Amino acid sequence: MAAKIKKGDRVVVLAGKDKGKQGSVLQVLPKDNRVVVEGVNMVSRHTKPTQADPQGGIKNKEAALHVSNVAVVDSNGKPTRVGFKIEGDKKVRVAKTTGEVING
């Protein structure tokens, strides 16, 4: 199935501790049906000192969210479902609320 959410999309969290927060997609994990969203679902990781990071310590990073818990934000700033439409010889993503083509 084609990807309805892609890297760089602006999304809003629909459920969980960060419900209502918006951010852009940093990474899509299609095998796990998960996405990593910038500044959302932050977790603390205890890292050992390495040559790349001699300090080590506790670092905050984004954890993956399930795709069903996020929705793409349309041009009006509201969450929308994503559909597909054929324009010429290309298949494009379309916002269900406004009918506009989603860039990406």
UniProtKB/Swiss-Prot annotation:
Name of the coding gene: rplX
A single BP term in Gene Ontology: translation
Domain of life: Bacteria
Protein name per the record: Large ribosomal subunit protein uL24
Sequence intervals crossing the membrane: none
Phylogenetic placement of the source organism: Bacteria, Pseudomonadati, Pseudomonadota, Alphaproteobacteria, Caulobacterales
Role, per record: One of two assembly initiator proteins, it binds directly to the 5'-end of the 23S rRNA, where it nucleates assembly of the 50S subunit.
Pfam families hit by this protein: KOW, ribosomal_L24
Similarity-based family: Belongs to the universal ribosomal protein uL24 family.
Leader sequence residues: none
